[in-house]
A protein has these predicted regions:
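Residues forming the flavin
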Residues: 1-43, 47-175
Length: 175
């Protein structure tokens, strides 16, 4: 379940933000396939102490179209121009394996019976599932409010903000 749009359609919405200053609350820099990082600079970075298998994750990116150079780079970088295609390839592989992706679908609540998760209720109906993974990013305040109101423990995570500066190549060449 993804409240935003697919990574390609989302690109149109991001261009619209720049052109008209109108922000679609469900398809913007925070919401949509690939999350906040999909249209960042393409750097792969974690501050988490729970790092897991970084090599495994980098291999997964390579299997879906990232350059194998990220396996050896001290600071792996896929690039803004390539990352959306890698994300799209990952989604297509999930679908090939029998998974399903529902875009423009908002989770409204978890279905819990007898202290067990049984699925989710969305704005488009119920989806039953034996397991649910919430990968909300940092801006799904409605989800956090719902979890809090149902006494489900949540933990705050640090927030990082980056800045991207673009300069004409002539200026950079002079420097």
């Amino acid at each position: 379940v993804e409240r935003g749009k697919d990574v390609r359609t989302r690109k149109v919405d991001l261009a619209n933000i720049s052109r008209t200053q109108n922000v679609d609350p469900e398809s913007n820099y925070c919401f949509g396939e690939g999350g906040a990082g999909a249209y960042s600079d393409g750097k792969l970075y974690t501050r988490s102490k729970k790092r897991g298998s970084i090599e495994g994750i980098l291999n997964l990116f390579c299997q879906h179209g990232a350059s194998p150079t990220i396996l050896a780079d001290a600071h792996p970088h896929i690039g803004t121009d390539k990352l959306p295609r890698v994300i799209e390839n990952m989604r297509n592989r999930i679908i090939e394996c029998g998974g399903e992706v529902r875009f423009e679908t908002r989770m409204e609540e978890l279905l819990v019976r007898n202290c067990r998760i049984e699925g989710v209720r969305t704005d488009k109906g119920e989806i039953l599932a034996s397991a649910v993974i919430l990968a909300t990013g940092h801006s799904a305040k409605d989800v956090y409010r719902w979890l809090h109101s149902h006494d489900i423990a949540i933990e705050a995570k640090g927030f990082a903000v980056g800045v991207r500066l673009e300069h004409p190549s002539e200026l950079i060449d002079r420097i």
